[in-house]
Amino acid sequence: VTLYRLMRQLLHRYDNTRLTTVAMHPRYRNIDTDSLPADLAVATEVNSYNYRYMYFPGDMKRYPEKIFYQSEASTEAMGPNFFEMELDKVMGLAYWGAVDYLGESLGWPLKGWNKGVFDMTMLPKPDAYFVKSMFSEEPLVHIAIIEKAGTDTQWNGINVATQRLSENWNRNQGEQLSLYTYTNVDEVELLLNGRSLGVKKNDADPKQRNRIRWDAVPYEPGTLMAVARKAGKVVARHQLTTTGEAVALKLKPETTDWHADGKDLMMVRVTAVDRKGRRVLSAHDLLHIEVKGE
């Protein structure tokens, strides 16, 4: 507590407009429902708990003057760990790690964290739109094909398993697929080449909200479209389309300001495209990269 107060004093010397906090993984009386706050938790201006958002209701009653924040939240539990919080009294959360990065690999051949909703170049993965549906009032719908179910993967005692998702609509004829439609409005209709596969309502249950699951969706070449409606009016669409075979590679650097000093690092996104310039998500060819220069 003393060190925190000294650091807060230093911070307020430069900026006294902001509240301060410390991320904590709290002790508990009951692991599922009831925390046992340390002295530091009571001393901070904002009570920040890693993962244990289920303790907020009890601690809100004990400390009604406090503001609460989920300082680390698991991407595996996305949805419930946001919607189950009493959002009028909780200022939000931070998903860890929402962006992939080098380091903290879960094993070779990975060189870094790969459980985020954005890759290392900030390209959104399908479930990034699930996060957007929580925080944005702009109507949206987004299709995510479930390629592989998550397995129980522990990292520092937290389950970090995530499903492998894609937007790939190049499949095998007759394949039966499971998918999500992420949305923040009332209902979604799924259409395959113009034929309706049904309409599903957005569930108010925090464990299901904004994430509608569809099973046994038949594949056929063409277009799979999700149409979102609010109060009966179409407010958003998203579609996946079958592409041709990959015939070229498109390279896009993150910036044109690249210094050839042997130290500067540049992210270059390599995309396989078909004859119409569309991204081919089914392309898994091994690439050989050669860099020349002085």
Predicted regions mapped to residue ranges:
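Substrate-binding clefts and catalytic carboxylate motifs of secreted carbohydrate-active enzymes
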Residues: T2-R27, A38-G262, R275-K276
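Short, well-ordered beta-strand segments
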Residues: E189, R195-V199, H284-E294
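Short, solvent-exposed loop/turn segments enriched in Ser/Thr/Gly
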Residues: G262-V268
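Short, well-ordered beta-strand segments enriched in hydrophobic/aromatic residues
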Residues: V268-A272, G277
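Short acidic/proline- and small/hydrophobic-mixed sequence motifs that coincide with surface turns
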Residues: R279-S282
